[in-house]
Amino acid sequence: MKAVIFDMDGVIVDTEPYNMRRVYEYVHFQQPNAKLEDMYQNAGRVKKDVWIRIASVIGQNRGWEETRSDYETNWKPSHPFEIPYKEIFRKDTITILKWARENGMKTAVASSTAYEKVKEILTEVQVVPYLDVITSGEFFERSKPDPAIYLKTAEVLGVSPGDCVAIEDSTAGITAASRAGMKVIALKDDRFGFDRSLADDEIDSLGDFIEHYQRLINK
């Protein structure tokens, strides 16, 4: 293997519960019958796909752009919500990145989140110096589970997709990396019912990654 590629939300930082809860509060205000579980399929997807689904759950014959605009303009300013990124940062990320560099491997993040937000979060948790490439789903017409973001990340790194291992947690992310032809090690998260069947291996924590990676490539 020549590269390790991380997803960000749910892997490097445990943001999924915060993101889902924040949006769910808005959705539930608009549609009292909505359930938190309705938000689970949003994990790992770009904003457009997320808001298409949210608009569908809310109903009211509003398009996704109008729904998102209402959320950003009217809801968010009156409902402040801070995510403690440093507190939910998985510090074993640094261990893996240092190990990868020491073993001649390139490193990247491939996240569905908007690029500036990805940079902001990764800078706050001090991961950026250990990365060769940061790729955002906002630059792609199709989001995870489409493999485009992973294929492009491998291209920018200058390696074959088959020489990459991806660390993912969500169904969409695991599917995207697998479709790109990469090895996939899934970080287990049973809170959201993610399907990990396409992963090559599973880990309970990032601290288990190096051992499982070595076992995987030595099969």
Predicted regions and their residues:
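Short glycine/serine/threonine-biased micro-segments
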Residues: 8, 42, 106, 135, ...
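N-terminal helical cap/lid subdomain that shapes the substrate entry/recognition surface
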Residues: 2-103
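Residue-level detector of anion-binding/catalytic polar loops
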Residues: 33, 106, 183
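Asp-based, Mg2+/Mn2+-dependent phosphohydrolase catalytic module
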Residues: 1-2, 98-101, 114-219
